[in-house]
Every structure is written in C-alpha cells, then in structure tokens.
C-alpha cells in the first residue's frame, strides 16, 4: 500500500512540473505584454557578436492586429534568431572584415546575394537595419538653418525582389533621420515580388517594429518602376513626394534642404547628392558635387559643374542647376507632379523616364536643382539583377517615346546613332503630345540654348565647348608600405606569372629576388596592393573560386581591397576570404582564396 502511495505521489509531482513548464513556455513565447526590447539580428547572417548599443533598433508599434501564434513562431522568431554559431568571432559594423566567410553557409549566402541582388548580401545582413553613416556634407551646410513651416513629405519606395535587409535599412534610415513632424508617410510599393520574405514576413515586421505611417501597397502584376511610382504617388497624401530607390540610406538633415526649396517655389524639383555605397563592401563614401546631362544616344551621364554655376553668394551650399536628373532620388510638390503629367504611363518598367521628366520640367516652366546640402547614399551595382517580364528592350521603347514627344527636329541626332530604330513601333503618344501643348512648353532648341548650352551638336557648324570646372583628378592615395609580399612558410615571394604589366595575368610564388623591381608591391591607404607600380591585385566578386589576377586599378575598393589581419593573414574584403598557397608541397606556387583559418598556407608579410 505504501509503495502505491509513493508511486502516485511521484506521478503527481511529474504532472505538476509538466503543467508549470507548459504554462511558462506559453507565457514567455506568446505574451506581448512588457517584454524587454532587444536587438533584432538579421535572418540569414553569419556568426558575429552583439553590435554596439547605439545600433540597437528603436521599436515603434505598428497597428495593433492580433498576431497569429504560428506565424510568430515560424517567422518572427526566425527573424530574431541570428543562428550565431561562434560568438567569439564577433565583428563590429565598422570592421573591414565584416564580410568574412566562416563556413559554407556564409559562402552560399554571399554568392546568392550577388546572383539575386548584384551586391554583397552577407555584409548587408550583418550590418542590420540601423547603422551610422558619415556626414558627407560641406561644413557650411552644417551651419544652415531652415524654416519651421516646411511641408510634409510622402516617401515613395518602389521595390521588386529587393534584399530584405537592404530594404529595411532604407526604411529605418528614413525613420531614424527624418523629423517626425515632416515625415507624413512612407509608402512601399511591392511590384509583384517573387521572394517569400517580402510578403508576410515583411508585413509582420512593419506591423511590429515600424510606425503606422509605414504602409505597403502590393501590385497584382509587374508594373515596373515607372508605373509603380505612379501607383505610390496616387496613394500619397503628403504635400511633397520624395521618390527613393529601395537600396538607399539617407544622411543627416537630408530632407530639410529639399523641402525648403520646394516651399519657396513649388515648381522646383530637387535632388540630393547621391553618395556611393559600395556593392562589394557596403562602405559609405562621399560623392563629388556634379550635375546631370545626357548624350545623343539618350543615356544619362554625369557632368562637371560649369564655372557659371559656382559664383553665387552661397558658395558650396548653393543649389546647382541640373539639365537632367539621375531619376532614382528626387523630391517634387505632389500637386505639381500631377499637374505636370506625372510619368509617361506608356513607358515600360525602367529607362528613359528620368530624361523625359527632366526635359518636361525645364521646357514647361519648372526648374531642376541638385542640392549639395542633401545627401543620400545609394548602392551602385555593376548590373541590374533582373530584366523585363517579357524580355523586351524597355530602354529603346521608352527612348523612342521620349524622342518623338520632346526632341523636335533634334530626334534626328538620336536616329543618326540608331538608324535601325526609325521604323520601330513605340505605342500611342497622342496623350503626351497633347499634354505638351496644354502645358505650353518651350521647344527643345530653347532647352539646348538656355539650359544645356554645353551639349555638343555634331556637324560642321558645331558650337564651341563651354568652359567647365577644371577637374584635377582624384588625389593619389598615400603609400603606407613598399616591399616584397613574402610567404612565411615557403620563404618565397608573390610575383606576376608573366610580365607585371600584363592585365589579367595570374600571380604565383617564386624565389625572392631582392634586386628585381618587378617583385615590389605598394600597399596604400586605399588598401590596394599594386605590383611594380602598375597593376592592382584583383579578385572577381562573383566567382570567388577564381584565382587573383593583376588588373587596372579602378580606385573603387571592393575587388581590389586587401587588409593585413591577425595571424599574418591577407584578407580580401569583397570576397571575404584569405589569400593562401594552394599546395605547400607543389613547386608551381599557385595561390587562391580560402576561408580564413590562420593556417601556415595563409601567412604573409610585406617586407621592405
């Protein structure tokens, strides 16, 4: 009898313990009341430690919908779980080794990022949704003040298959660096993206961690950037429309200069200076102040600023008249955007719309300026990671519409370069022709004479080139060290396989010859390794299995950016791997890249 009593007592204890365990699990996993705020790591990133406190997200509750528990368990918990495998390999957001590959999973994520997005998604994910960026404005801009009665802004961001981390970093940068009373709303237009994380997971994140003024509109089919922006603008209710790309980061005091000019003249369209975010390293760097132009192939180009634009009393902070805009980032009074005809809805997807709206602004009574005191960073990719839905050449289609509506007799300059397009169909332009008449627009000759006199017209009577600001070229980076790149284990030096001047040539290990100047490397403050003062050591960002080669120095970092780290390793920033000797026993001396492990095959020293 006693044994039976003890047995049931034990059963009771077990049942009670199990009940409390279940209750505590439910409470801590599903309660939404008074849970402590914590850093939100990025899904899919590699191992790294916690980021500094100043980078922690500032959470703001979105609209209070009842959350589905299963969704929370499967999506949001996975979003918060960074799958940290080795916290000792912690990396700060400013680390040059933020893109380091630790395992095959990191390598797959990095390679997938270049394939899907044409930039380093591994680094993007590790950066998180908040980071500090350098204030790249001229010092005079920091002393400027702006009116208190500025108009409110609707930020329109159209995206298609964007990287989740890049999109949210764009949104958070706007929320973090825009005064709340000026930010009327952020409208995200999903142009029928295919990626799952841009659907329910994005909605849930916005609901939980962003203000209610962040809204998502989803197109039922692919409309393209042009019509996507028109859809976003149709939903906007702020006084000013600000269009941004989906892989940007706005800088400090970015919005106030734009709004101040529009407050002064609602018929003025303004663009920020577009700073550079490297596609390979995501490093943020300043851009020079230039202005937009175009060529007779109807492609946008950047021009130096004419001397005539630089003599005003405001000096380096003065707005710069720009004949055209790049198109990705600009602000415009919402009513003026509608009155001026929005975009040409007959244009498809992307391409040419920036020139069309630029010509229309100037020819129909408006103004277009670039503002040096407004800065926005933009990831500049080397290619577009996606095409048109049907594979059509939208740039040609859109350029033809532009030429036939706005160029008048100067469209023959375009057709002289593209005679194959003279009889190509471009759709019905009657509405746009009628719009031009209704707005009472000037001729294209007026535009060339008054807005872009620097534009050359080929022919025997070509006008002389107008003077422009002298460009003295970029300053040469300072040399930090000069010597032979010595491999500690083999006692050999890294040299060119053939001539040191051969572009695309391989490098390998050979016996060091201290009398041979072609074995001498220069390491400079831009982290370039230059052999014989001729070519840079370069890696393919998209084919990390390829060996390093000697290529012309491009000065953009990324594929030519190397750092000497601990354990004498030579780390390639954009590839995220270290230089190694392929086989220590092989006399051929071939080198390649591998996951950094501090092994003897990866130990190098630059010796004078």
Swiss-Prot record:
<feature type="binding site">
    <location>
        <position position="386"/>
    </location>
    <ligand>
        <name>substrate</name>
    </ligand>
</feature>
<keyword id="KW-1015">Disulfide bond</keyword>
<dbReference type="GO" id="GO:0018243">
    <property type="term" value="P:protein O-linked glycosylation via threonine"/>
</dbReference>
<keyword id="KW-0808">Transferase</keyword>
<feature type="disulfide bond">
    <location>
        <begin position="578"/>
        <end position="596"/>
    </location>
</feature>
<dbReference type="InterPro" id="IPR000772">
    <property type="entry name" value="Ricin_B_lectin"/>
</dbReference>
<keyword id="KW-1133">Transmembrane helix</keyword>
<comment type="subunit">
    <text>Interacts with NOTCH1.</text>
</comment>
<feature type="binding site">
    <location>
        <position position="247"/>
    </location>
    <ligand>
        <name>Mn(2+)</name>
    </ligand>
</feature>
<keyword id="KW-0812">Transmembrane</keyword>
<feature type="disulfide bond">
    <location>
        <begin position="493"/>
        <end position="512"/>
    </location>
</feature>
<keyword id="KW-0430">Lectin</keyword>
<dbReference type="InterPro" id="IPR035992">
    <property type="entry name" value="Ricin_B-like_lectins"/>
</dbReference>
<dbReference type="GO" id="GO:0060271">
    <property type="term" value="P:cilium assembly"/>
</dbReference>
<dbReference type="GO" id="GO:0007220">
    <property type="term" value="P:Notch receptor processing"/>
</dbReference>
<feature type="region of interest" description="Catalytic subdomain A">
    <location>
        <begin position="150"/>
        <end position="261"/>
    </location>
</feature>
<feature type="binding site">
    <location>
        <position position="245"/>
    </location>
    <ligand>
        <name>Mn(2+)</name>
    </ligand>
</feature>
<feature type="disulfide bond">
    <location>
        <begin position="364"/>
        <end position="441"/>
    </location>
</feature>
<keyword id="KW-0914">Notch signaling pathway</keyword>
<feature type="binding site">
    <location>
        <position position="222"/>
    </location>
    <ligand>
        <name>substrate</name>
    </ligand>
</feature>
<keyword id="KW-0597">Phosphoprotein</keyword>
<keyword id="KW-0328">Glycosyltransferase</keyword>
<keyword id="KW-0479">Metal-binding</keyword>
<dbReference type="GO" id="GO:0046872">
    <property type="term" value="F:metal ion binding"/>
</dbReference>
<feature type="transmembrane region" description="Helical; Signal-anchor for type II membrane protein">
    <location>
        <begin position="7"/>
        <end position="29"/>
    </location>
</feature>
<feature type="disulfide bond">
    <location>
        <begin position="536"/>
        <end position="553"/>
    </location>
</feature>
<comment type="function">
    <text>Polypeptide N-acetylgalactosaminyltransferase that catalyzes the initiation of protein O-linked glycosylation and is involved in left/right asymmetry by mediating O-glycosylation of NOTCH1. O-glycosylation of NOTCH1 promotes activation of NOTCH1, modulating the balance between motile and immotile (sensory) cilia at the left-right organiser (LRO). Polypeptide N-acetylgalactosaminyltransferases catalyze the transfer of an N-acetyl-D-galactosamine residue to a serine or threonine residue on the protein receptor. Displays the same enzyme activity toward MUC1, MUC4, and EA2 than GALNT1.</text>
</comment>
<keyword id="KW-0464">Manganese</keyword>
<keyword id="KW-0333">Golgi apparatus</keyword>
<feature type="modified residue" description="Phosphoserine">
    <location>
        <position position="95"/>
    </location>
</feature>
<feature type="domain" description="Ricin B-type lectin">
    <location>
        <begin position="476"/>
        <end position="607"/>
    </location>
</feature>
<feature type="topological domain" description="Lumenal">
    <location>
        <begin position="30"/>
        <end position="608"/>
    </location>
</feature>
<dbReference type="GO" id="GO:0004653">
    <property type="term" value="F:polypeptide N-acetylgalactosaminyltransferase activity"/>
</dbReference>
<keyword id="KW-0735">Signal-anchor</keyword>
<feature type="binding site">
    <location>
        <position position="191"/>
    </location>
    <ligand>
        <name>substrate</name>
    </ligand>
</feature>
<feature type="topological domain" description="Cytoplasmic">
    <location>
        <begin position="1"/>
        <end position="6"/>
    </location>
</feature>
<feature type="binding site">
    <location>
        <position position="378"/>
    </location>
    <ligand>
        <name>Mn(2+)</name>
    </ligand>
</feature>
<feature type="binding site">
    <location>
        <position position="350"/>
    </location>
    <ligand>
        <name>substrate</name>
    </ligand>
</feature>
<dbReference type="InterPro" id="IPR045885">
    <property type="entry name" value="GalNAc-T"/>
</dbReference>
<comment type="similarity">
    <text>Belongs to the glycosyltransferase 2 family. GalNAc-T subfamily.</text>
</comment>
<dbReference type="GO" id="GO:0000139">
    <property type="term" value="C:Golgi membrane"/>
</dbReference>
<dbReference type="GO" id="GO:0008593">
    <property type="term" value="P:regulation of Notch signaling pathway"/>
</dbReference>
């Amino acid at each position: 009898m006693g044994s039976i009593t003890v047995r049931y007592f034990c059963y009771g204890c077990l049942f009670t313990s199990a009940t409390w365990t279940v209750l505590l699990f439910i409470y801590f996993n599903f309660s939404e009341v008074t849970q402590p705020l914590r850093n939100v790591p990025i899904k899919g990133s590699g191992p790294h430690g916690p980021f500094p406190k100043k980078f922690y997200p500032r959470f703001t509750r979105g609209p209070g919908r009842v959350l589905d528990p299963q969704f929370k368990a499967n999506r949001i918990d996975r979003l918060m779980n960074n799958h940290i495998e080795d916290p000792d390999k912690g990396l700060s957001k400013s680390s040059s080794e933020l893109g380091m590959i630790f395992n095959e999973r990191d390598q797959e994520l990095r390679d997938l990022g270049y394939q899907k997005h044409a930039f380093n998604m591994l680094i993007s994910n590790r950066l998180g949704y908040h980071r500090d960026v350098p204030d790249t404005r001229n010092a005079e801009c920091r002393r400027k003040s702006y009116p208190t009665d500025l108009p409110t802004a609707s930020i329109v961001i159209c995206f298609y298959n964007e990287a989740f981390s890049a999109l949210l970093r764009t949104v958070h940068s706007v929320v973090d660096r825009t005064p709340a009373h000026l930010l009327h709303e952020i409208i995200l237009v999903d142009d029928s993206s295919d990626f799952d994380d841009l659907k329910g997971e994005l909605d849930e994140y916005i609901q939980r961690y962003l203000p209610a003024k962040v809204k998502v509109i989803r197109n039922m089919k692919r409309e393209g950037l042009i019509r996507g922006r028109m859809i976003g603008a149709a939903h906007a209710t702020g006084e000013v429309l600000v269009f941004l790309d989906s892989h940007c980061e706005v800088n400090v005091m970015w919005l106030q200069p734009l709004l101040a000019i529009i407050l002064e003249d609602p018929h003025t369209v303004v663009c920020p200076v577009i700073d550079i975010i490297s596609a390979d390293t995501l490093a943020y760097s300043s851009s020079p102040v230039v202005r937009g132009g175009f060529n007779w192939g109807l492609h946008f180009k950047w021009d130096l600023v004419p001397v005539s634009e630089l003599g005003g009393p405001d000096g380096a902070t003065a707005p710069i008249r720009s004949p055209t805009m790049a198109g990705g980032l600009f602000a415009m009074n919402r009513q003026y955007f509608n009155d001026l005809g929005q975009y040409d809805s007959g244009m498809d997807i992307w391409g040419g719309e920036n020139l069309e709206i630029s010509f229309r602004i100037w020819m129909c009574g408006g103004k277009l300026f670039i503002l040096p005191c407004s800065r926005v960073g933009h990831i500049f990719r080397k290619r577009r990671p996606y095409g048109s839905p049907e594979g059509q050449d939208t740039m040609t289609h859109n350029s033809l519409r532009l030429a036939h509506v706005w160029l008048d007799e100067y469209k023959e300059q375009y057709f002289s370069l593209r005679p194959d397009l003279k009889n190509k169909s471009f759709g019905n332009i009657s509405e746009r022709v009628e719009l031009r008449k209704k707005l009472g627009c000037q001729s294209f000759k007026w535009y060339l004479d008054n807005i872009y006199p620097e534009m050359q017209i080929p022919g025997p009577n070509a006008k002389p080139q107008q003077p422009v600001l002298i460009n003295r070229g970029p300053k040469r980076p300072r040399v930090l060290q000069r010597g032979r790149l010595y491999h500690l284990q083999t006692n050999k030096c890294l040299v060119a396989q053939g001539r040191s001047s051969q572009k695309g040539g391989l490098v390998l290990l050979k016996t060091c010859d201290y009398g041979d100047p072609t074995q001498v490397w220069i390491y400079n403050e831009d982290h370039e390794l230059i052999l014989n003062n001729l070519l840079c050591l370069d890696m393919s960002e998209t084919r990390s299995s390829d060996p390093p080669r000697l290529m012309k120095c491009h000065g953009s970092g990324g594929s030519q950016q190397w750092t000497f780290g601990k354990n004498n390793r030579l780390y390639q920033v954009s590839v995220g791997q270290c230089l190694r000797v392929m086989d220590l026993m092989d006399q051929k001396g071939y080198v390649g890249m591998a996951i950094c492990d501090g092994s003897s095959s990866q130990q190098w020293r630059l010796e004078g």
